[in-house]
């Protein structure tokens, strides 16, 4: 049996490179939405990259949650720029309100700690047009100059939705609702919306042409609000996993599969994230798990209790 490297042979799309996109030629307005929190230095690089885009018909909406808010930062940019201060530190609220305020049918979500090439907007629009898709999910890299991972190196139906690099039709939100605010300050809000879009028949294409460098800086953003890893609580007596993880799982996959999900993931989660993949420490965690068992059980039941409250309060 011959082994085939599907990522390099089976899914080539040479006609994309020569495709003359009618959508791109029509130059529709694109609304780029950026929530920000305590990252003016990085946001400046973001706006400079947008100034250098080869596609020019776009507006930028910045929802600033920084303390102290510096209105002077927004002067002198060569952009169609709108901004406002949001007192509450809330990512999904910021995105929902900015989407509602957007003037365009095309909404492009972006992060405040990322870098992009000059053809970023163009490639998103071209992909939407070429595949007659509803969503273009760009690729995110963590290192400047890094090679795109094989499973993201070709066009395909996307199995993720990254709200730091994705283009939507605004009408999708009118149809299936906005981001679920019960994920605020927690995890998987973008994944839940992606699942909702998929179940409602929207075509989401993984787009290797629209890549970004996600710097994942330590200051500001969601990490400042106390959430980074869905399985490793920040506080000793915090729920494990983050309640929104179980909320998502129970909402879409039910109680039984969520229990299997816990059994599969809970022991590896004891190992700190920076040591993830260390085989020796992983074995040590498995050997010492009985010592942690009562404490872990408390964390899991606490998370389950909180996710139950979320299920009772869900609006979608």
Residue ranges and their predicted role:
Residues 2-21, 35-37, 253-316:
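Non-catalytic, C-terminal membrane-associated alpha-helical segments of glycosyltransferases
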Residues 48-57:
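Short, acidic, metal-binding catalytic loop of nucleotide-sugar glycosyltransferases
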Residues 86-102:
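Glycine-rich, basic loop-to-helix element that forms the pyrophosphate-binding segment
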Residues 103-104, 162-177:
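Conserved nucleotide-sugar donor-binding
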Residues 107:
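Short aromatic/hydrophobic "clamp" motif used to bind/position activated sugar donors
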Residues 115-152:
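Conserved donor NDP-sugar-binding/catalytic core segment of glycosyltransferases
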Residues 185-195:
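Acidic donor-binding loop at a coil-to-helix junction in glycosyltransferase catalytic cores
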């Amino acid at each position: 049996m011959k082994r085939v490297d599907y990522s390099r042979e089976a899914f080539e799309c040479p006609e994309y490179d020569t495709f003359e996109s009618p959508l791109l030629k029509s130059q529709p307005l694109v609304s780029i939405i950026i929530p920000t929190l305590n990252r003016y230095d990085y946001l400046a690089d973001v706006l400079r990259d947008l100034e250098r885009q080869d596609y020019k018909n776009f507006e930028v909406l910045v929802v600033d949650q920084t303390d102290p808010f510096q209105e002077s930062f927004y002067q002198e940019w060569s952009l169609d720029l709108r901004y406002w201060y949001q007192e509450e530190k809330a990512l999904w609220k910021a995105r929902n309100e900015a989407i509602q305020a957007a003037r365009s049918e095309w909404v492009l979500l972006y992060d405040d700690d990322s870098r992009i090439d000059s053809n970023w907007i163009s490639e998103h629009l071209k992909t939407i047009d070429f595949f007659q898709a509803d969503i273009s999910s760009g690729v995110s890299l963590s290192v400047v100059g890094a090679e795109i991972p094989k499973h993201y190196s070709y066009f395909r139906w996307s199995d993720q939705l990254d709200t730091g690099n994705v283009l939507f039709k605004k009408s999708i939100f009118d149809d299936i609702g906005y981001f679920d605010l019960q994920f605020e300050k927690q995890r998987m809000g973008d994944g839940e919306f992606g699942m909702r879009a998929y179940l409602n028949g929207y075509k989401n294409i993984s787009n290797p042409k629209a890549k970004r460098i996600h710097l994942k800086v330590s200051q500001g953003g969601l990490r400042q609000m106390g959430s980074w890893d869905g399985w490793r609580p920040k506080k000793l007596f915090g729920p494990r996993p983050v309640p929104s993880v179980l909320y998502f799982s129970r909402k879409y996959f039910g109680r039984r599969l969520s229990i299997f999900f816990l059994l599969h993931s809970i022991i590896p989660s004891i190992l700190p994230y920076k040591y993830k993949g260390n085989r020796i420490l992983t074995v040590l965690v498995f050997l010492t798990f009985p010592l942690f068992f009562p404490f872990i059980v408390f964390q899991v039941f606490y998370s389950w209790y909180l996710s139950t409250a979320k299920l009772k309060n869900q609006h979608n």
